[in-house]
Amino acid sequence: MAKDEIHGNNISAERIREIADMLPEKPEGIGVTYKDRTYWDKMKNTPEARKLIEEAHTSLKDGMPPFVDSLYLHLNKTEIRLPGENMMNARYQYLWRLVLAECLENKRRFIPAICEGVEELCRQKPWSIPAHDRNLHNYHGTDYYVDLVVATAGNTLAQCIYLLDDRLPAETKALAMCAFREKVFRPIYRCLEETKPFYWFTVTNNWNSVCLAGVTGAALALLQDKEERAYFVAAAEKYYVYGMKGYSDDGYCSEGVGYYNYGFCSFILLREEICRATKGKIDFFRTPKFARIAQYGKKIQIMNQVCPAYADCRAGVSPSWFITNYCDNVLGTAPYEEKYKIPGMDNLSLHTIGMFPHQAWKVEMTPEIQEVLKAEADELHSCYDEAGIIISRPATGSTCRLGVSVKGGHNAENHNHNDVGSYAVVMGSQTMAGDMGGPFSYPGDYFSGNAYKYPIKNSFGHPVPFINGQCQVSGKKAQGVVLKKELTGGTDIFQIDYTSAYATAVPELEKLIRTFTYNRAGEGTFVIEDRFEAVSGISFETAITTRADWKMIGNNRLELVLGGEKMTVDIEAPGVVEFDSETVEVNSPAYTRIGIRLKKPLQSGSVRLIMYPSRP
């Protein structure tokens, strides 16, 4: 198919020509084609490769999973996402698996099925998932929209075509190019030059990096004309800054660790695609902010690779080993031995760098970047002042067994939960109490106006107060104003005023102060204290959220047991307290909300939770 004419005004024609002069004569993907038998024969003997080849033979026997219209349309009828998404992903993963198996085996055994699979995907109108095609424009092929999955699956398909090189017939490649122009390249060009940019071009969350990496990678791998390729590089150069605004200037990712793994991994991919194509002439890493973002994967860990599961981070998620290793390699912050392996099939394009050698284009080490790296070294603390996040750890070799994270922030963050005043308490490799994270899969209305009906997202499912029967309110004005931050080698104190998080819901409330105190002495102690004042008596309840088994071991004492660890919680409060418990389960492992309620309404008072490792 002939190239598309480039004659828009949004992306500078002069910049397109400048970038075109930097690009290679022919399109190039990530990694090496099947012809590099030194690489592929070496990989063939790895356990991951043997497993993949075995799975590919099973897939070949079963055939490509069908496109099922009723499953694609299921979401609009039921608000349940997974059936349609699983159907789409199974089709993509079938093809990726066969392509990698063919590169490994080099016997042409999978080529006929691969060609049929490529042709099926080209005939399939939507490449998006149903959640991003509510109006069914992609499904009907009337007005194509590029979403996260079009970008990532499209890039993976483009990389597969590059890897197979001349193994694919010219007719199959031509059909694929027609599909890419229809579903990816022309919709991007049209929205940038003729209508208005898709929302993700200027959004400040993971969508920006994910979609830019996918579209740019596909263009660099497929488009023969240098100026066409340069157009997509220039577009990425113009718009990537919006995604970076989603990280605070000190490097914090408000979407949580899981979306850092997704979004920043995508940004790394985008950076590598463009660095390699331009031989380092364009490098998005050349600022101090990116050095700070690169350090987030290490700084956010409390201890033993356990991280706080704030926002929509899934419980148990740790920073990607690839990201931390890649950043060490790029910045020279730790000894680095390059490792590469066959990845899983999910979001394959995001993991192609880690599959091949020569993974990291070294960043130019400026004095500003060097200064950032010097400032990051603190074994006991990590601080993100802009986000109101602190990590406090025990000293290496000490008797202290507790590590904690505490949170101020506000209630208008990316993938927001209403959770000002939240925290996480870790013993060993277990999160004993605190923020329990987000869903493992999203309900269909999770990103609608109904989202805050879910306790996993509203403050009821978090370890924060429930006052006069009211949860925290949403919005940036609902914030934790830092009153005190004292971090030492022994005791850390962090105090916030978060009255504003309840002010409009509980007008009687005059003041609500939460003080966190972490003490490294002995085996460690963590105290959460709330002090409140009101114009009249109010009902006051706080909560412990946990996936531990728990029991009362005294009138005002609880014990939490999880993964071989035991933690005691003492409750200090004026008068009698009442306890209740409730199970919270929203498409994620269930957890318990233990409500701790003052029996009588009070005009002022305080509640202290004192947590420490249980003693024999």
What are these model-predicted stretches?
Residues 433-438:
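Catalytic Cys-His active-site segments of thiol-dependent hydrolases/isopeptidases
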Residues 206-208, 259, 415-419, 462:
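Histidine-centered active-site/metal-ligand motif
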Residues 40-90, 100-104, 411:
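Asp/Glu-centered strand-loop micro-motifs enriched in Gly/Pro and often flanked by an aromatic residue
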Residues 2, 151, 341-347, 441-616:
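CBM-like, beta-strand-rich accessory domains located in the C-terminal region of large
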Residues 2-52, 97-103:
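Extreme N-terminal leader/anchor segments
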Residues 71, 130-134, 198-203, 307-314, ...:
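Short coil/turn segments at secondary-structure boundaries
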Residues 37-38, 46, 85-291, 295-301:
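Aromatic-lined, polymer-binding surfaces characteristic
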